[in-house]
């Protein structure tokens, strides 16, 4: 499995829900910060986005706005709209809702937004989410000039929202995973910075090392064995990895192992020794020491507090 595919496995995208927001005149809504990927697809009209970190963007009919890490944001009819009494649409999410929420004042100026929320594991997904911008804007996604993969993907999303069939939830999760992956691919293809964790995902050699780390964290990896995955010398691999990922191969490996350990402490019934073995530590003592250095508490105490 390639690096990007394995990292998307780690994110555990699930429980995708959607709703339609029908707007007219002066309108606004907001969404609180949450552990979720948020996608707004502008089907008609336009929308102005303001994120908690100050990022702003205006999107038009046919555009997609992706909020990868679920940052709190405010959406309105234009940048000048300072409405205080705006709707928190999170309360309207209820699985798959096809009856539109209506917002705004009486006007001939109509709009329609298809909003999707997919829950994700923010901790396991942190390398990807931290590397992505807080907002990704895909222009003209549904026009004839838009990427073909996106038009086809959105067609299937639209089709699935109109059907009530067994397996619908799972299919919709898969469709949202595809949409997210393609948006990330599109973003990486347009990156100006050749030295970032995102470009390492597509690097012909380094991506092999990342895939190996994420697929087999329990293996006793060394710089040499990771270099072998890339068919490179130890020194060349170590230098290239550091220059693009901005940390050493073994530091990256340890961070991934500890992220996985946190997930297992929260979600599994494995004991501490079993978790240590599963994430590549030869002893419970070595694992506990590394965990405590990172989180300033023992694995046992962390599990009790979770």
From Swiss-Prot:
Q: Which residues form the HTH araC/xylS-type domain?
A: 207-305
Listed InterPro entries: AraC_lig, AraC_XylS_family_regulators, Homeodomain-like_sf, HTH_AraC, HTH_AraC-typ_CS, RmlC-like_jellyroll, RmlC_Cupin_sf, Tscrpt_reg_AraC-type_HTH
The processes (GO biological process) annotated in the record are:
alkane catabolic process
GO MF terms here are: DNA-binding transcription factor activity; sequence-specific DNA binding
Could you tell me which SMART domains the record lists for this protein? HTH_ARAC
Answer yes or no on keyword DNA-binding.
yes
Q: Which UniProt keywords apply?
A: DNA-binding, Transcription, Transcription regulation
Instruction: Summarize which parts of the chain are annotated to bind DNA, as ranges.
Output: 224-245, 272-295
Pathway where it operates: Hydrocarbon metabolism; alkane degradation
Task: Extract the PANTHER family matched here.
Answer: ARAC FAMILY TRANSCRIPTIONAL REGULATOR, HTH-TYPE TRANSCRIPTIONAL ACTIVATOR RHAS-RELATED
Which named protein is this? Answer: HTH-type transcriptional regulator AlkR
Q: Which organism is it from?
A: Acinetobacter baylyi (strain ATCC 33305 / BD413 / ADP1)
């Amino acid at each position: 499995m390639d690096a990007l595919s394995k990292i998307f496995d780690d994110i555990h995208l699930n429980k995708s829900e959607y709703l339609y927001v029908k707007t007219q005149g002066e309108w606004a809504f907001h969404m609180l910060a949450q552990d979720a990927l948020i996608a707004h697809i502008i089907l008609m009209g336009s929308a102005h986005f303001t994120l908690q970190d100050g990022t702003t963007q205006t999107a038009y009919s046919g555009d997609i706005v992706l909020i990868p890490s679920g940052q709190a944001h405010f959406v309105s009819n234009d940048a000048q709209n300072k409405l205080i009494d705006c709707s928190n649409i999170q309360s309207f999410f209820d699985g798959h809702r096809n009856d539109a929420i209506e917002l705004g004042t009486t006007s001939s100026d109509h709009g329609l937004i298809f909003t999707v929320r997919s829950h994700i594991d923010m901790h396991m997904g942190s390398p990807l989410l931290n590397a992505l911008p807080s907002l990704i804007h895909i222009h003209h996604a549904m026009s004839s000039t838009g990427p073909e993969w996106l038009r086809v993907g959105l067609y299937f999303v639209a089709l699935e929202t109109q059907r009530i069939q067994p397996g619908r939830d799972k299919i919709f999760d898969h469709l949202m995973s595809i949409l997210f992956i393609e948006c990330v691919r599109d973003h990486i293809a347009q990156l100006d910075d050749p030295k970032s964790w995102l470009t390492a995902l597509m690097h012909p050699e380094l991506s092999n090392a990342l895939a190996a780390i994420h697929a087999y964290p329990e293996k006793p990896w060394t710089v040499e064995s990771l270099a072998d995955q890339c068919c490179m010398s130890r020194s060349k691999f170590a230098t290239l990895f550091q220059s693009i990922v901005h940390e050493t191969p073994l530091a990256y490996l340890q961070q991934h192992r500890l992220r996985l350990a946190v997930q297992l402490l929260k979600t599994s019934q494995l004991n501490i020794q079993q978790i240590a073995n599963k994430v590549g530590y030869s002893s419970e003592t070595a694992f506990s020491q590394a965990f405590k250095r990172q989180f300033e508490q023992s694995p046992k105490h962390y599990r009790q507090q979770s």
